[in-house]
Amino acid sequence: MDTEFANANHPLHFLHRLLPAVGPGLLIAIGYVDPGKWAATVEGGARFGFDLVLPMLLFNFVAILCQYLSARIGVITRKDLAQICNDEYDKWTCMFLGVQAALSVIALDLTMILGIAHGLNLLFGMDLSTCVSLAAAEAILFPFFATLMERCKASFLCTCIAGFILLLYFFGVLISQPGIPLSINGTRTKLSEESVFALMSLLGASIMPHNFFLHSAIVLQHQGPPNISRDALCLNHFFAILCIFSGIYLVNFVLMNSAANVFHSTGLVLLTFPDAMSLMEQVFRSPVAPFGFSLILFFANQITAFSWNLGGQVVLHNFLRLDIPNWLQRATFRIIAVVPALYCVWTSGVEGIYQLLILTQVMVALLLPSSVIPLFHIASSRQVMGVYKISPFLEFVALISFMGMLGIKIIFVVEMVFGDSDWVGTLRWSTVSGSSTSYIVLLITACSSFCLMLWLAATPLKSATRLDAQVCNWDVQNAVSEPSTLIEEEFLTENICTGEELIERQEQLPEPGKSFESYSNITVANADPDLPETIMESDQELHLTTIKEKHSEVAFSSPQTFYEETSPTTESASLSASVNLVPDAELLVAKKAKIESMDPVEKTLDIEGELHTEKEDDEGDNWEPEDSSKGVPGSTLSLTSDGPGSFRSLSGKSDAGGNGAGSLSRLAGLGRAARRQLAAVLDEFWGQLYDFHGQITQEAKTKKLDALGVDLKLASSQLKVDTAGKESSGYFSLVGGRASDSLINSSLCDSPKQLRVQSNIDSSYGVQRGPSSLWSNHMQLLDAYVQGPSQSIADSSERRYSGVRTPPSSDGWDNQPATVHGYQIASIANRIAKDRGFSSLNGQMESPAPISPSLGPRNYRDPLTVSMGKNLQNGLSSSQASGFQNLAVTRNSPLQSERPYHDVYSGSADDTGMSANTKKYHSLPDISGLAGPYRDLYMSEKNAQWDKSAGFGSSVGRSAYEQSYYSNTGSGAGGPLSFNGLSKGHGDAFSLHMTPDPGSLWSKQPFEQFGVADKIRAVGSGLGNRSNSINREVTSPVDSEAQLLRSFRHCIVKLLKLEGSDWLFRQNDGADEDLIDCVAARERYLYEAETREMNHVDHMGGSTYLYSDRKSGSALRNDDASITNIMVSSVPHCGEGCVWRSDLIISFGVWCIHRILDLSLMESRPELWGKYTYVLNRLQGIIELAFSKPRTPMSPCFCLQIPASHQHRSSPPASNGMLPPASKPGRGKCTTAATLLDLIKDVEIAISCRKGRSGTAAGDVAFPKGKENLASVLKRYKRRLSNKLIGSK
């Protein structure tokens, strides 16, 4: 029966044995859930790849060794390490050890504060100064929660919470690991002077000095069952520590591997705290990652505080002789930690915070050599540990570990003083300028710690010194022929009197008779000191607990019995001075009588027993952590930035990147290449309107593009009527007309009158695409913004940095023929063969394969046929072949001026003079509804040349559908098509009719008889054909506004395609920014819907134009640029309250200014400063329009509706079923001049702190010049905004 009962309780018994070992390990390991350690790990991986993986593993083994030795000391001696050091070292040595432990605790507290501040910043959007203050203020909650629970309950609860957090932390990383391959194929470790700084930071992140003292103290609070031997208990502690620290290393390895793959492989450098945090947030690929991090850090901070409450007071009492309440102790440490945090936030910004985290770990590493000496000395001391001293092998491992730490420290100090590494230069220039004390602090810390280490290494333990003196006296006493009893009594009396102070310092162990028992350990002269360590502790402890009541039994035992019943502790060494000279067991009678008659000994034991009980009561203080995840409503967010913006993660509102993080890895989620592209896209857009002085360009005035100041009150039928199928290549040669757009914008091109209005405008370059006047109108609108060849930044930067953030692209699709009409095939055949890899075309091209029936439904689903039919068919007779047009380009056309950039098209027409030797197409099938979409689909793919012009008209010579129809001619299966010359009879228009025979290849298909294709064709047929004359008519304000809005849509789509663009549209600023966020959310939805539709068609095998190098990926990747064309063909309009009017461009200007200033807060690359300066220079023209007079915020209209099923993916999220939410309460006003002035001040402070390395081109030229240029434009902004601010008052 007893056996069955024991078996039933076996799991409970196992847990009862395991918890005393696992509990202390969990409470210690929770301190490694620390942003400082993440930053050090990510920094090592980002700078040196996988070179530091092996050193980090070795550091983890050393940490396991140190924590095991600390726990072993507590288990064996039943005293914590601080108490033993107090016994073994003098007062001043203990004081310095206490200062080192306090510095380590303060460093941990500092990193925890910064981590919690970062979490608050992500969750609530507050600036970092406020977040740091709030994170520090939570210390006042500790006394309140500490009084709510009893000591044992608080300890158990905190242990459980610590285990739960660590499990979430470990398994969360492993389960949610991003798609970054783990590189475990043994890379060689390459160490150099450049990596010493990173090695020191990893060492400090792996081992914390105060944990040595804390672990041994917590072990005393988690005593194991009395029937377990101490060897078994030590083994339990070892396995618990091994498992926990293995999990910590696994997490660090995943972080380092991710950093090496994301940052080191792409050459990016981390410079800010959000950079490191962004990678950690990427590892947890969940939308609730910021909230989870904040919660984990909050609980980790409270449990760390509880752990220090369990053992920290003993440390301070034994080292610093301080007896202060726990709450005051915690508040003092918190205040000391907050001072450098706030100083760094105010002076150095986000980049300074990141450097502070790394420097904190380095400073902790500098303290390690002097901190491990007491640990290793005591663990290997026979006088303290007795037979439980560590084995010679462990002593050797400890010595090697110490030498390794000391060697790294020496190399670090020597390099810091005499070296010229990059990290040394970074520390030195701040010292020369007097703006930072980090170099001096590290140097002082290293020197003082080195001196203390030498002192500790040269100072033996007091117990060892006393034992040596006793051995000397033993030899002298053996030469004296006196009665042994008299010698013993005199010696014992003298030593007890003179050693009273020593006895009073001993702590009473749980067993009252332990001090007496310790005498017997040394009394036995013939005892073997190398007795095997297999004595069962259960028997020893049984005798020890009854020793006070059975003195006679113990006193008259044999010497061997005394030794077996002894627990070798510190008392055995400290009291041995009074009993070591007794050679005979007979003297034990006198010794026992004298000890029992001594009041000081008994008094000391009794008092210490009471103190032990009181200490247990005092150390029970704990407080239950409060959930810090309570949301703050968006209405409490301020529009202004409080404090230096450079110290905030992009105004404290970055989402992953971070906030995350240029030169930085991902500055607020935008990589370096993405930021370059962002600046290029914005410069490209605003370059159509403003020059670099913020003035309207002459060309914009000529073409009436300065429509932002015009109050247009035109009917909706005249506002957004342009449904051109082609935007200029500067914005990805657009094709419009999506089914979703068609359904929403019912007023688009729904009457012949609207078409006639637009049909009166010809192309400004005199290029007529076929007989369609509407086409001419649109090309005139698109060409109006041509700026010249200088706008090649966007796509060239994409190609150049494609390996960093964007998929690689080629220009194989860039220079394909726009159409076969109006061009000589021979002049472009070689170019096509080069790009497409054809061996030869020989003047002939294969026609596409017969159209798949699956293309029909695709055409039918787009009822408006905005770009698929209308752009091709307007102005054509219903009997004309609308799939192709004739382009008659005259020799005097202004298009010739664009030949350097469009020579493939204009050159062919100009050089050949449209020779009559070439043959012209005379008839073509009416497949406009089929060929158009798929010609458009791939038109912009790899559009490196045409996507970089500033305006809309740089690719005048090619139409939206002409480009891609023959882009994959090599894959066609049809018969050859001959193109010989431009027929005079058909130079301006198609005159051939289609064969009406339904069985003919050219007959109208059934699905072409529906929709609006015929309607548009009929309307177009009445417009007639137009000549190639150059029409320089000035466009109306309506047309100008339509052009700008289409360009704006195109710009938004390009921004959405940037890697990490989510941050751009989730900043929750003013009403203008919220409106742009809603527009971006709508455009994203449309884009993704079209992507899914295209993917569905491809999956069904309906596309004959699939190109071989198409890659799968994100819906907003650059390799899906072709789908962009289908989205931006028109401008929505839902009525009088529609947001799609010129005011939207003003809001976009405010948004651009805000985003550029936000990026400038954290940017540290002079190259990008220059790009931001270009954009800000142009955006000066918006200031007058946006801030000269109060503006009424526009609310999102029905054009911005998003289905409820998609709202969780949109940004910002919608609050109702259809419409995005209006501006949030409290933030419903437009961004004011005061808001931007505060932000500009923050940028100026941030930029002033950025410096390059002296003696380099970057430090001596790029940084000063970049700062000068950016500061200049910021001053102009301040002057203009200040004037507007005064005027508004």
UniProtKB/Swiss-Prot annotation:
InterPro entries: EIN2 (IPR017187), NRAMP_fam (IPR001046). This is Ethylene-insensitive protein 2.1. One of its GO terms (cellular component) is plasma membrane. A motif (Nuclear localization signal) lies at residues 1274-1281. Residues 635-652, 807-816 have a biased composition (Polar residues). Central factor in signaling pathways regulated by ethylene (ET) and involved in various processes including development, plant defense, senescence, nucleotide sugar flux, and tropisms. The N-terminal (1-562) region seems to be regulated by upstream components of the ET signal transduction pathway, and may in turn regulate the C-terminal region. The C-terminal (454-1289) region regulates downstream events of ET and jasmonate signaling pathways, and can confer constitutive responses to ET. The nuclear localization signal (1274-1281) is required for interaction with ETR1. GO terms for biological process: ethylene-activated signaling pathway; iron ion transmembrane transport; manganese ion transport. Belongs to the NRAMP (TC 2.A.55) family. It comes from Populus trichocarpa (Western balsam poplar). Residues 616-626 have a biased composition (Acidic residues). Coiled coil: none annotated. Residues 611-659, 792-816, 1208-1227 are annotated as: Disordered. Keywords: Cytoplasm, Endoplasmic reticulum, Glycoprotein, Membrane, Nucleus, Phosphoprotein, Transmembrane, Transmembrane helix.
